[in-house]
A protein has these predicted regions:
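A conserved beta-strand-loop-helix scaffold within acyl/acetyltransferase catalytic domains
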Residues: 3-77, 204-267
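Hydrophobic pocket-lining residues that define ligand/cofactor binding sites across diverse proteins
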Residues: 83, 100, 279
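Conserved acetyl-CoA pyrophosphate-binding loop and the N-cap/start of the following alpha-helix
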Residues: 83-95, 270-274
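Conserved GNAT acetyl-CoA-binding A-motif
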Residues: 100-112, 283-292
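Active-site/acyl-donor-binding loops of N-acyltransferases
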Residues: 122-143, 262-422
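Amide-forming acyltransferase catalytic core, primarily the GNAT-like/NAT-type
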Residues: 129-156, 161, 173-175, 179-278, ...
Length: 422
């Protein structure tokens, strides 16, 4: 068996395996293999010229705590049916992680088909969503909730009546106050059939800047997202204000029993609240919103928190030494890391923090251990999906209680937002 990068002549077989393994529409598969999946981004295991198992590594950049770094989205891991349950997927994943490590990519992520398959191989939750269920009569109070990231507005500066959605209507007029003006200006929420990706990206970047982290989308990423969204019957809704243009958008799916809001991004709390209040009333059906795992600028019912993405460290030393840490913390710990796939990540590291927001990680084989964790647990800490309190509760890090508590101050709770499907 040979494991290597795919070439152009392998794409027909890669498509065969995809069609055999996934229930995607032919139009999507045509687009994906024509526009998205480049041979050099695929890795496969071959027996002679026969492709047995393969995956796709889509390049992305991640912004986390004010820093950006290259990453790869692991997509479409699949094996020909007659070659399954022979350990090929595990072998391919190991090769892939080492390949990424050589390219300087210390962190990769995926949307799992089975959580347990990946977590036992060293993946950990790196992206989770809050699932809100809103009734058609939901009212969003004008007063913003406290302690909210991003922009806030002064109380009493806005007026937002609950919209009435008449049958057949696709727009609603509202009253809005923008900036420091005191005059009321018209605002409108409407469905957009040909959205400008640049406009959506402007809103996405402005909105996500208040989050702890997110995936940065390129023009190509937006093209794929919109193609897939419309192919599945999705709609784009924009909230527009006079003088400032669109200030919020929604990736919306009308459903038979309930509507799904895949993503809502907004430049001000007022724009987000009005967009949500309008969509909650569409078709007089409940609205299910998959939102970031972060505080909102308006109160909503308690959500369900759902893990969506898993992350994997490929290079432990590089991941730990990337400057993501709060300044002012100093200390040294002998950290034992357990990695079920990569022996080069498995062992004892001397982790030293010098108070400048950076740490060093030096392998020290054979030394006594202060703290122990897995690569999956460390992925959770780095991404912020588990803050210190949850890390202690779930025993993601073990050792002396005082050492654990102090070390975890390096890893505050965050809200890395991921919501792309390929």
């Amino acid at each position: 068996l040979i494991t290597r990068r795919l070439q152009e002549q392998d794409m027909r077989q890669a498509r065969e395996i995809w069609e055999e393994s996934f229930n995607d529409k032919p139009a999507f598969i045509d687009w994906y293999f024509r526009r998205r999946f480049r041979p050099e981004e695929g890795i496969g295991i071959f027996s002679g010229s026969l492709l047995l198992c393969n995956l796709h590594l889509a390049p992305y950049r991640v912004r986390l705590r004010g820093r950006t770094f290259p990453s790869a989205y692991l997509i479409g891991l699949a094996t020909r049916e007659e070659y399954r349950r022979q350990g090929l997927a595990k072998e391919l994943l190991t090769f892939t992680l080492r390949s990424l490590r050589k390219k300087g990519v210390f962190f990769t992520f995926l949307m799992p088909f089975a959580m347990s398959f990946y977590t036992r191989l060293g993946w950990g939750i790196c992206g989770q969503h809050r699932i809100y269920r809103l009734s058609p009569a939901a009212i969003f109070p004008e007063k913003e909730s406290s302690g909210t990231p991003g922009k806030t507005e002064r109380a009493g500066k806005e007026s937002s009546p609950e919209p009435a959605v008449a049958a057949g209507k696709e727009t609603t007029l509202e009253l809005a106050v923008t900036g420091k003006e005191t005059a009321l200006e018209p605002a409108i929420t409407e469905k957009e059939t040909t959205p400008d990706p640049a406009v959506l990206d402007r809103i996405y970047r402005g909105w996500s800047s208040s989050l702890d982290g997110c995936l940065l989308r390129t023009e190509e990423d937006w093209e794929g997202l919109l193609f897939d969204h419309f192919l599945d019957g999705g709609e784009i809704w924009l909230h527009k204000e006079t003088g400032s243009g669109p200030t919020a958008y929604a990736l919306f799916y009308p459903g038979a029993k309930e509507n799904l809001l895949r993503e809502a991004a907004y430049l001000t709390p007022a724009a987000g609240r009005r967009l949500l209040q309008y969509l909650a009333a569409v078709n007089n059906k409940p609205l299910v919103w998959s939102a970031p795992d972060a505080a909102l600028p308006f109160p909503l019912p308690d959500p369900e928190v759902k893990p969506v993405f898993l992350g994997r460290i490929t290079d432990l030393k590089a991941a730990l030494e990337f400057p993501l840490y709060p300044p002012g913390l100093t200390g040294a710990w002998r950290l034992r890391v357990e990695d079920p796939l990569l022996p080069e990540n498995d062992g004892v590291f001397l982790v030293t923090a010098n108070g400048d927001g950076k740490i060093s990680a030096t392998p020290v084989p054979g030394m006594d251990v202060d703290l122990t964790c897995t690569t999956g647990g460390l992925a959770r800490l780095l991404s912020g999906t588990a803050g210190p309190e949850e890390a202690v509760k779930r025993r993601l890090l073990t050792g002396d209680d005082k050492l654990v508590s102090f070390f975890l101050r390096l890893f505050p709770k965050g809200d890395l937002y991921m919501n792309d499907y390929f």
